[in-house]
């Protein structure tokens, strides 16, 4: 039991670091970096680099999921138990809240903008000269998040599959994959692919009256879970019957 709590604590710490550091870069870069492109690249790199850092820090303890969607995929692939899945998710949500709180403190108690996800202008419609979010925008955002999470999670499953390699470079592959989906998705949804990372800032931002992220939270929770489940199922199908490869001479 003691060893299990070490895993849960590692997940809590890892998710706190992800939320504080990566969302922190997104918020700060938005204020000091000139031009949308600079912010876009800085934010994408921040999320990817945090994953690399955490993968090689806590990966040997908990597997470094730091994302309920990843934990769901691992549950479906029978890499973790249902009990571990439940405690992982709790730890991840708590960690994300802690990370968001630390970020808010660094911003002098400003809870209004902590990196919560929102449907972006590319998916909005123009009504009377104004960009607005309609039903199509919401479901398009849901579809985008499913695809982004599918790409991210299937990269995780492939790079950590011990049947094909030892996984020592998995952290780099996973970090680059998260950078990729951020580069692709920031203009559509702000890129979630992680329910915990989206829920925490949405809850805290709501305290200041900024409820947009919270009103769309069903997207940031359900879409990543759906994308992760799809990735786990598809990966299982395309690798079924594969045996562990022999080392090359």
Protein language model features and the residues they cover:
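Membrane-interface helix-loop junctions and terminal tails of multi-pass membrane proteins
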Residues: 1-249
């Amino acid at each position: 039991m003691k060893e299990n709590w070490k895993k849960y604590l590692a997940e809590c710490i890892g998710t706190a670091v992800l939320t504080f550091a990566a969302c922190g870069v997104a918020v700060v870069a938005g204020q000091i970096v000139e031009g949308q492109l600079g912010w876009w690249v800085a934010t994408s790199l921040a999320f990817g680099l945090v994953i690399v850092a955490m993968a090689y820090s806590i990966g040997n303890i908990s597997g470094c999921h730091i994302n309920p969607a990843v934990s769901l995929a691992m549950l479906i692939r029978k890499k973790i138990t249902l009990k571990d899945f439940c405690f992982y998710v709790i730890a991840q949500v708590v960690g994300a809240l802690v990370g968001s709180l630390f970020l808010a403190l660094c911003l002098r108690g400003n809870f209004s903008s902590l990196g919560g996800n929102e449907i972006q202008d590319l998916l909005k419609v123009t009504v009377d000269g104004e960009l607005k979010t309609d039903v199509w925008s919401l479901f398009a955002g849901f579809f985008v998040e499913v695809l982004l999470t599918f790409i991210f999670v299937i990269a995780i499953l492939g790079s950590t599959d011990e049947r094909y390699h030892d996984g020592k470079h998995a952290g780099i592959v996973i970090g680059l994959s998260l950078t990729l989906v951020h580069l692709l998705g920031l203009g559509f949804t702000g890129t979630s692919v992680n329910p915990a990372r989206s829920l925490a800032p949405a809850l805290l931002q709501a305290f200041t009256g900024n409820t947009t992220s919270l009103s769309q939270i069903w997207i940031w929770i359900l879409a990543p879970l759906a994308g992760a489940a799809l990735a786990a199922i598809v990966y299982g199908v395309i690798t079924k019957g594969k045996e562990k490869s022999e080392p090359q001479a």
